[in-house]
């Protein structure tokens, strides 16, 4: 005899998170953006693990399809920051590194090392190797002697010894890391990849952000402006914070909530040929002065200048300082 499920005679109560999914997914005419307050509440429920997995997937993919608004990103960021238990450490630059590189080596890592040698305190954070065929910061930390920190105390110690630290996202926002890790389950990157770039967990003086896809740079700048943050957003090479010297670079800035724009000319007369393959040992060779190569030196000098611009130096002065720092670097590694 077959046992049948009982009939549903009463309408089940709606899940508290359901309205947020409905707002985003209610058809072409019925759907709308979340307000900043709604975004803060929705992200708070995600972080507090008060949603079903099906709701999480639906929410992330609806956002991905729609594209996040500045108000949504600001609200999401506020929810994350409210739940952080980070110490009050003095930091100059927040340097998110989530994209990975595939066309050029991550020369920006040498830029960060050189800045740190000159007293610029930098926090780097990333979300691991989520996409095949890319070279990620986490894979190079040991060889480049960038401290891998697993808690804020280790970050503080690293700052005291060398002004540079990397901490994985999963060690200070595990729920966000879980969402990023859905990349290969859902088949698409989620909006968390974008959100992570805004978080600036230690409230650094300036947050650098790289957004590769056209049109998104202004959205991120506007979101940071709503938060009152000081940031520079660029279209960095491969989605990482690295100036491409072969192209014009547009800087989308926000200082204390006030927007500004700046355009930097290309640094090379003609485009460089991309390497046939990525050889990480070339990073150390360039640092040690064993090889000379136009592209990486232009890229890392300009990237250092970008960080210095974020700390208030005018462009020309930032480039002069960056060149001085690079020429005088401690080449041991």
What are these regions (language model features)?
Residues 100, 125-127, 168-171, 209-213:
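Glycine- and other small-residue-rich loops at beta-strand/loop junctions that grip anionic moieties
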Residues 186-289, 293-297:
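A structural signal for small-residue-enriched, beta-sheet-centric alpha/beta enzyme cores
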Residues 2-104, 116-122, 269, 283-292, ...:
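Acidic, glycine/proline-rich low-complexity segments that act as flexible tails and inter-domain linkers
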Residues 300-311:
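Short, small-residue alpha-helix embedded
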Residues 150-210:
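Phosphate/diphosphate-binding glycine-rich loops and adjacent basic-rich segments that engage nucleotide
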Residues 90-157:
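A generic, well-ordered mixed alpha/beta core segment in the N-terminal half of proteins
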């Amino acid at each position: 005899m077959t046992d049948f499920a009982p009939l549903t005679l009463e309408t089940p109560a709606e899940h508290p998170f359901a309205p947020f999914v409905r707002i985003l997914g209610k058809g072409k005419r019925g759907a709308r953006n979340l307000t900043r307050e709604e975004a803060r509440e929705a992200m708070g429920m995600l972080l507090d693990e008060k949603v079903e997995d099906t709701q999480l997937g639906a929410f992330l993919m609806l956002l991905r399809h729609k594209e996040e608004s500045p108000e949504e990103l600001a609200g999401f960021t506020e929810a994350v920051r409210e739940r952080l238990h980070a110490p009050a450490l003095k930091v100059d630059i927040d340097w998110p590194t989530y994209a990975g590189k595939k066309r050029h080596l991550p020369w920006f890592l040498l830029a960060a090392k050189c800045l740190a040698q000159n007293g610029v305190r930098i926090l780097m954070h990333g979300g691991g190797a989520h996409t095949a065929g890319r070279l990620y910061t986490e894979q190079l930390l040991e060889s480049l002697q960038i401290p891998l920190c697993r808690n804020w105390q280790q970050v503080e110690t690293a700052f005291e010894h060398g002004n540079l630290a990397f901490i994985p996202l999963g060690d200070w926002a595990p729920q966000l890391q879980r969402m990023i890790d859905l990349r290969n389950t859902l088949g698409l990157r989620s909006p968390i990849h974008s959100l992570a770039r805004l978080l600036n967990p230690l409230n650094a003086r300036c947050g650098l952000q790289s957004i590769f896809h056209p049109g998104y740079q202004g959205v991120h700048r506007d979101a940071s402006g709503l938060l009152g943050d000081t940031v520079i957003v660029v279209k960095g090479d491969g989605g990482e914070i690295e100036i491409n010297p072969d192209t014009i670079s547009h800087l989308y800035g926000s200082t204390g909530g006030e927007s500004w724009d700046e355009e930097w000319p290309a640094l090379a007369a003609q485009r460089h040929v991309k390497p046939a393959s990525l050889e990480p040992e070339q990073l150390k060779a360039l640092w040690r002065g064993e090889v000379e190569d136009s592209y990486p030196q232009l890229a890392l000098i300009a990237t250092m200048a970008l960080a210095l611009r974020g700390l208030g130096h005018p462009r020309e002065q930032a480039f002069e300082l960056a060149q001085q720092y690079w020429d005088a670097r401690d080449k041991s590694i």
